[in-house]
């Protein structure tokens, strides 16, 4: 306010005008603040309701909200300055008008004084003439100038109508103020009172952007001209009249140097005209790509992900928000759910829809899926589709009830494949988290009730139309009648406690709350013991959970603990009915407690008066009457609960048996494939080994043969050398001492010599 009060002091702004402008600014600031607060609260509540929120994602979203907050603050400041600067020049002229009027009043007062002094001067003049002794002449009194005032104008002695100073001021200042307000005054020096500093900065930025476009336009034109210079030279060589061809090229070169000149001067009926005009066409459309780029930059960016299978299954785009994904999931799940047993195809579709929502309905899993595709969800533990649909159905009423605590805990329990010991060790941390979450949950429900009941409080006759539409959409889901009956009963008696004769309803609420606490403690113990017996270990979890990475090891036949999938049909049905019944009862007690606290917050608001609180109580009672049409009473509640429990258990058992059969078939097919692959590998390896051994043996044999040949040659050479020496010695002996030799010996010696020669 101090900042904007400077306008009042600087431009001498009238008090009424300043108060009017400041009122508009206050209203604008309040509206912006309320809108911003509502959006931020809604955003943070959506984050808080998520099971997991990555720290980096939270930081990024927080920074984006801070940027949006600052942008809205700047916009409001800009709008307020616009309001304050809207007619500053008119106030200047009004002040000028006042000063001119003040001067005109002074001038008129001075003129009246002068006119009053004129008769005195004339009398003194006549007296002087009389005293001078001259002839006494009768001097008739001179009449005053015949000036008549005609409203704002004067008429002189000649009959001309002259504008007064006041009329001139009015024409120059008052009319200017009126024309400025109407927006028709065209004085270039003093008009445009709405042109502020922000407008000047905007125009400078716009001019800068236009200069950048002009620069890019010139560069594109020069590139086009360079591309077409070859064509121009080609045309110059082949035209009949070279002089006429050269003229357009010169004009075109001049046009490239000075692109501000229009292209009309280049157009001449020459042969090269077609080639010269092509750059001008590109020049005319230079601005179009810039506008397309600008439009694409302003549009929402499309996420590029490696795998879109789950998005295709749900029939949503990759940019779909959680509300759209949830709505699409329930629509598809409700179509497939009743027909699971009709064939494997329907169950397969129902299973895939649940898998898709288990991934895309969770922020962390969705982020990993968007980043890595199928590889990012290999370790995700998927629940039995019917169990997941049961928990999702209990969460479907979250606008009226919030997400039940048992649903949050069981999802955490199943998805993390925790044992009961792990759950007990983390119980303290979980309880603290659930207590804080419960407060936020009750505040959300109370806010939602206020939003849907506000039209009824305001007296709108059609306030119930959106509520009926909402309840019609919830109709048909699992355990819808028990949930609506609990909400109806709580809303009815809470509303009565704030109206006349409230003691009876207050007593009923107290008795029901105490009974719920006692039953809730027993049911919690029974559920924990049952889960610990049949789902206490990760091996026992295999009957209702699975993942893609260890899908072949999900069935553990060697486990000696009790497994639901190993029980008989009767025992399996009995155990599952107990578990489902316990889960539903705990959810209903939790829903009643949450609805009770939220309704009390709504009807005990200290920021409103008693009359408004009474209207809220009456509206809440009307809401309970509408819910009664869909609930059908306590007797119908028990029947519907029993029927839905048996129905859900039947589909859970069907899902367990179907998934286990698929896994067993896969496990049985593995050894056959392994044996077949082993035999094929053995044959292939044998062939490769034979070839490899043959090659190695051949090489080794060749090397060995070469070595043997070399050794034999050396030995033969040595033997031959030795034999020659022996022969020489024998010859010497023969010469010295003649020896007698038989013919047989001679024949043997010759034969041996020939044999040795042949071997060598």
From Swiss-Prot:
Keywords: Cell membrane, Glycoprotein, Malaria, Membrane. Disulfide bonds: none annotated. Transmembrane segments: none annotated. Residues 231-242, 262-288, 683-692 have a biased composition (Basic and acidic residues). PROSITE patterns: DNAJ_1, DNAJ_2. It holds the Pfam family PRESAN. It is found in: Cell membrane. GO terms for cellular component: plasma membrane. InterPro entries: DnaJ_domain, DnaJ_domain_CS, DnaJ_X, EMIR, J_dom_sf, PRESA_N, PRESA_N_sf. Glycans are attached at residues 425, 559, 563. Its main location: membrane. Residues 214-300, 683-738 are annotated as: Disordered. Residues 307-375 form the J domain. It is a peripheral membrane protein. Residues 216-230, 243-256, 693-720 have a biased composition (Acidic residues). May disrupt the normal intermolecular interactions of the cytoplasmic domain of band 3 and thereby facilitate the invagination of the red cell membrane which is necessary for the formation of the parasitophorous vacuole. This is Ring-infected erythrocyte surface antigen.
